[in-house]
Amino acid sequence: MSSSTPVQPPAVGRVYLVGAGPGDPELLTLRAVRLLGKAEVVVYDHLVSPAVLNFVCPTAERIYAGKRRNEHTLRQEQINALLVRLAQEGKQVVRLKGGDPFIFGRGGEELQTLAKSGVAFEIVPGITAASGVSNYAGIPLTHRDYAQTCLFVTGHLRHDPHVGNDSNSADISGDIRADLDWPALTRPRQTVVIYMGLSGLADICRQLMAHGLAADWPIAIVQDGTLASQKVLVGSLADLPERAKTAGLTSPCLIIVGEVVKLHAELAWFSPDAM
């Protein structure tokens, strides 16, 4: 009777779509930290804070797949194909995205590709920038006296020829006027949060005023929210674009529009120096 070595079944790969939160690594979920510590490959985006990568297993392969305006390391189709290939090779892959992967992160599109290819996947939510950054800026998104509705908006849309086809790009470009529902953005008693809006700030403010908001309507812009480098500028639709330019703000920035912005002076608590 001959003996033979048992044939090992092929390793089964899996992709974990993980939200990295708004920047501060202490805002990661426990599950995100655990998965980063055991992943074989981590494919991460531009908006992932470098401090978050400290949780990655030292032996894991790290693949940067970030996109900025006019600077794409990999096209989206290449990223999709990469995730499929790694999983089919039997790897345990973390696809790491800034904020929450299902809010302006193209996570849904990537998972559609995995599903069509028969690749197993799981989703780990993260704190989206609107929530994390507004909290660190001391600006509640809803308040009984000011706002019962909150809208999340991105100025970077699918067909934008200047930026490319990636909502994780760090900024917007081109004419956004025809793409946003401006009347909806100027309704009373609501807060509007605009992702990736720094380069379009002047146009955004002009359009909001043209569609009915007062020139002195409160608006804030936050750079590097939740990080030690966080900067918060509060002003009006009329003056904030010039003030932001003078301050030399750079991406990533988040814009918050609405009367809740007035609460920043009272509720600001975050001191980067105390981190």
Name what the model sees in each region.
Residues 1-25, 30-127, 132, 241, ...:
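Class I S-adenosyl-L-methionine
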Residues 2-3, 12-15, 88-93, 149, ...:
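A contiguous loop/helix-start segment that scaffolds small-molecule binding in enzyme catalytic cores
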Residues 45, 65, 124, 153-155, ...:
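Generic beta-sheet signal
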Residues 60-67, 118-122, 141-148, 212-221:
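Short hydrophobic/aromatic-enriched beta-strand-loop microsegments
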Residues 61-75, 147-156, 192-193:
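Acidic/glycine-enriched edge-of-secondary-structure segments
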Residues 98-188, 231-234:
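Class I SAM-dependent methyltransferase SAM-binding "motif I" and its flanking Rossmann-like core
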